[in-house]
Amino acid sequence: DVLARILDGEPDAVLFSCYLWNIRETLRLAAAVKAARPGAYVVLGGPEVSYNAGEVLAENPQVDYILSGEGERSVPMLLASLAAGRKPEEAAPPIPGLCARGFLSAPCVEEGTPPSPYAPAYLENLRGRIAYLETSRGCPYACAFCLSGRCGKPRWFPLEQAKRNILTLARSGAHTVKFIDRTFNANPAHANAILAFILKHYGRDIPAGVCFHFELAGDILREETFALLEQAPPGAFQLEIGMQSFCEKTLAAVRRKTDTGVLKQNIRRLVAMGNMHVHIDLIAGLPHEDLRTFGESFNTGYALGAQMLQLGFLKLLHGAAMREEPEEFPCVFSEDPPYEVQKTPWLSPEELDVLRAAEDALERCYNSGRFLETAAYAMAAAGLSPFVFYCRLGAAGARHGTANIPLDDYTAFLYNWCAALPGIDKACLRDAMVRDRLATNSTGRLPQCLHVTDALLGRAVKRLAQNPATAPLPGVRRGVALLYGTRQVVFVDYTQKNPVTGRYLLHTRSIDNLFTE
């Protein structure tokens, strides 16, 4: 119990970091702390209270102070003032970012390099988890939907410090080191030096298998960066590239500077390298984007072939221009976190529901990697664009109640829904779905909806085992199935997933030739 653990230490002050995902629970917890220890100071910080400190203080009497903005310098100054029995509002020099009732300060933006946050207790708990690393703060952009541009101009920390932290985190047992620099390649020299350092030490001082995640601006990538990324071992790098929209009017309205032509070209180039997991983002609910234009952005993004296309929904964050300038950005949004858009002049609530259902279908079929071939075949055979396909599939899933059903049940639902589309050959549909299931499910077992009793399968398994070129590896599980649309046998040995796609390698042999080899 978090409250019990806090009170067990009999604290004189309790400080909370507040984010979208924890603000409601944090305020309840703060009230409980104040009720149990009325003399203890309750202090909040973090992005969810930095731009609305006066409102939070007015609505929450249990909160004594808010530290707005960066806190590395202000936290120790506040604690020193409280420990000395002095009023923090009267501290000299002033405590940056300090907010109290009747005393508000602008969010603190530090110019110097922050101290290392990597205490031994943090490092000891990283095994099998994600470690977070920043080598810069601030953002060169000022997107109206985002807070990053409110955090000051970009400031890059010393490279030697970044290199030390990379080695420390990579050796901690974490499976991923995620750079939280808002635009990692905004300073190409800094970014390239870090990439080169990782590549130089990967597999030596940096254990093989550790993955490094970067958020990039795709349209400003330089040739030197491409050359470094191309050298990365498969699965060593993950790239996240925010597109948000391909509608030029929308991008201009939200003050997002993007060369969409260069962006598309560069994403295709990164995907074609085949050694990195590429994640791209779209946001639904932005200005001037209706269902038709959003569909165009979706189809454009889907065609780029990234391993993940995330369909997110606009959130009206405290401090973001889209929340603070409602006349310019009119929309209805939830008053509760995460403040998600409910209606815009261009999208009705019903249309947003269509997109949410499409997002669910996209996650299950494409982003999961589970039904890539199934979706590709169904779209091509039925003549549907990706956007229409996922909107219709999502709507059918919502009607069917697929939200929490097991994978085998969803497979059956997907098969039956796709089979009813015009132009679908059921044998070819089954082939695609069998390949998907074998490539992503290491049991090698097919669900009942794809199961066919055929004596030929047993003969094929035996024949594969007899041929040295296709014999199974000792002690390795194998999956085998017949493909009736193409008259092939498909088999897979579950040894190692592709580190980029997360799928196992499939092998096929012609049924007609199998018994003559």
Give, region by region, the residue ranges found by the protein language model.
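Short helix-capping segments at alpha-helix termini
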Residues: 34-39, 61, 87, 200-208, ...
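Residues at alpha-helix caps and immediate loop-helix transition turns in enzyme cores, especially N-
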Residues: 25-29, 55, 71, 158, ...
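Conserved C-terminal portion of the radical SAM core fold
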Residues: 15, 163, 168-180, 202, ...
